[in-house]
Amino acid sequence: MALVVKDDVKISEFINLSAAEKFLPAVMTSVKTVRISKVDKVIAMENDSLSDVDLLKGVKLVKDGYVCLAGLVVSGEWNLPDNCRGGVSVCLVDKRMQRDDEATLGSYRTSAAKKRFAFKLIPNYSITTADAERKVWQVLVNIRGVAMEKGFCPLSLEFVSVCIVHKSNIKLGLREKITSVSEGGPVELTEAVVDEFIESVPMADRLRKFRNQSKKGSNKYVGKRNDNKGLNKEGKLFDKVRIGQNSESSDAESSSF
């Protein structure tokens, strides 16, 4: 779900806490901690890319607990001269989900003529600390119509999240209220100035296409084989040792909000 927002991040835009919850010690409330993550950056170097993004950067997690991704603010800046043609679609992905329409949490489209842009997503769901430590979120970037030589960076994206860290799910739904959530599944918003180059293809379909390309050996995104198999020198399949998914996101120098 996506909405245009200002550049700053305010917890009140995502969560309504009572006066008691704001001032009581953490041990006296089920909502242990509301945190804003550090900024994580993704540098878009290709027209199509699927990159890991650390939405919980700098957030102290609770062992054997949970973390709720209450809200996310994404800001972008085109590294281009003024009045360039083209544009981009940005989509947040939960890589745990195998169905592409369920993996897409929300998307946003804008043109290169708008040099700076920002939008927010309200995923509003919890994952376990164990899953969170494996960096389960990705960003799918689809740049179209930008005429730039390969190897240069047309677009920079920054991500910062508002999250709730808690030990137990009990009473959580009674003690916090997520605001501005609409029903009907992921929402795609489009700027009014988007050029005609934007194809009317849902981001879920783009994700499906990208994942299929990756399975065929595409080098745009290298992931772990789902079947945990490999080939020996004779071309026969053999089991490989499973590798964890604690890969680092492709980010630049970050700072705390």
UniProtKB/Swiss-Prot annotation:
InterPro entries: TMV_movement, Viral_movement. Residues 247-257 have a biased composition (Low complexity). Belongs to the tobamovirus movement protein family. The keyword Transport applies. Residues 224-242 have a biased composition (Basic and acidic residues). The keyword Transport applies. GO terms for biological process: transport of virus in host, cell to cell. Transmembrane segments: none annotated. GO terms for molecular function: RNA binding. Residues 212-257 are annotated as: Disordered. GO terms for cellular component: host cell cytoplasm; host cell plasmodesma; host cytoskeleton. This is Movement protein. Keywords: Host cell junction, Host cytoplasm, Host cytoskeleton, RNA-binding, Transport, Viral movement protein. The gene is MP. It holds the Pfam family MP. It is found in: Host cytoplasm, Host cytoskeleton; Host cell junction, Host plasmodesma. Transports viral genome to neighboring plant cells directly through plasmosdesmata, without any budding. The movement protein allows efficient cell to cell propagation, by bypassing the host cell wall barrier. Forms a ribonucleoprotein complex with viral RNA. Binds microtubules and modulates microtubule stability. Can bind double-stranded DNA. Its main location: host cell.
